Amino acid sequence: MSDTLLNPYFGEFGGMYVPEILVPVLKQLEETFVAAQNDPLFQAEFTDLLKNYAGRPTALTLCRNLTKGSKTKLYLKREDLLHGGAHKTNQVLGQALLAKRMGKTRIIAETGAGQHGVATALACAMLDLPCVIYMGAKDVERQSPNVFRMRLMGAEVIPVQKGSCSLKDACCEAMRDWAANYETTHYLIGTAAGPHPFPTMVREFQKMIGEETKRQILEKENRLPDAVIAAVGGGSNAIGMFAGFIEEKSVQLIGVEPAGKGIETGEHGAPLKHGTTGIYFGMKSPIMQTKDGQIEESYSISAGLDFPSVGPQHAYLNASGRADYVSITDKEALDAFQALAQHEGIIPALESSHALAYALKLIAQNPDKEQLLVVNLSGRGDKDIFTVDKILNGGN
C-alpha cells in the first residue's frame, strides 16, 4: 500500500483490508479527498454549509449546577445543537460533497443510533442524492424516531436481520452493497473507522469540534482545559475533539468506551481495553473476538456505541499512551443522562452520557481539586427518551 497518497496506518493500526475490487475505488476516494482539501472552492462550500445549514460554530456551555460543592469547572461542547442533533452532520456534509465531486449518483450508509442515518438523509435531501441506509433490525426497533426522520427525508431504510441485528451487521451489509455497486455508489461511512482513507478523512471533517473548543475555552478561561472527554464507539466525535488537542501535551485526552452491563459480564463494547488486534471492517484494529477469531457481539444501552471495534487512530493513541481510555456502565450513563436533564435542562444522547458520567466521576473523586474539564456532548437525547422511559419505569 506504499502507493497511497497519505499514510494508511497509525502505528500498526489501520490499512486497507478490502476485496481487490474496492482498492481502485478507495484510491479514487483518497485522490478526490486530497484534491478537495487543497481546493479553496471545496473548502468554501463545506464551510458555508457548516455555518449556514448545520449551524456552526456550536456553543461551549458552562455547567452551572452539576459541579456545585466542587472546585471543578465543567464545560460542554454542544454538538447536540447542530442541525440533525449530533456531530454526525459535520463529516456527512464533507463526504456528500466529495461523492458529488466524484460523480457518484447514489449514497449508502450504515447507522446504529440512527444519528448518522439522519445526517446522511438530510445531506442527501439537500444535495439531491438518492440514499439507502442499512440499520440493524434491533436498532430499528429501539431508535424508531430516527427511522421515521430518515424516511421523512426520502431515505430508504433497510432493517438488517442477520447476525446480532445491530451496527456490525449493518456495516457488513453496506460493504456488500458497495462491492456490488461501487461504480455509481459512495459508501458514506459514519465513523472514524473502516479502510483507509476513511479514518483520516472523517477526522479531518470532524476536527472543527476540537479547533472550536480550543478557541472558545481560551476565550472564556484564558487557558487550555486539563482534560477533554468524549465517548468512543467507532470514535468520530472523540477524534474530532482530540484533533484540536493532540499536540497540546498538557491536555489529557480521555475516551470513554461502554462497559455495558459490566466488563466482567462480557456484555460491553470496550475493544480498546478488552479486545485483541485483528482485521475487521477493512482495517487492523482492536476487536472483540473469540480465540478463534470470530467477532463477538458487543453490547451497550447506547446503539451508537454498540460496535465491536474502534477506529485505528484511537488504537494508536491508546498504544502510544497519548490518550487514556476508560469505560462507563449503562447504569452510570443513565444516572448522568438524568443528572444533566435535571440540573442543567439539557437532555444528552446516551452516547454522550457515557462521557459525562466519567467527568462526574472525576469530579466526585476530587471535589477539592481545581480542574477545568470539557465534555464533548456529541448529540441530543430526544432519540433515547423512549428507551430510558422504559428502563426507568420497569422495562428492561
Swiss-Prot record:
Keywords: Amino-acid biosynthesis, Aromatic amino acid biosynthesis, Lyase, Pyridoxal phosphate, Tryptophan biosynthesis. SUPFAM superfamilies: Tryptophan synthase beta subunit-like PLP-dependent enzymes. The keyword Lyase applies. The modification N6-(pyridoxal phosphate)lysine is found at residue 88. It is an enzyme of class 4 (lyase). Its cofactor is pyridoxal 5'-phosphate. Belongs to the TrpB family. PANTHER family: TRYPTOPHAN SYNTHASE (PTHR48077:SF3), TRYPTOPHAN SYNTHASE-RELATED (PTHR48077). This is Tryptophan synthase beta chain. It comes from Actinobacillus pleuropneumoniae serotype 7 (strain AP76). The gene is trpB.
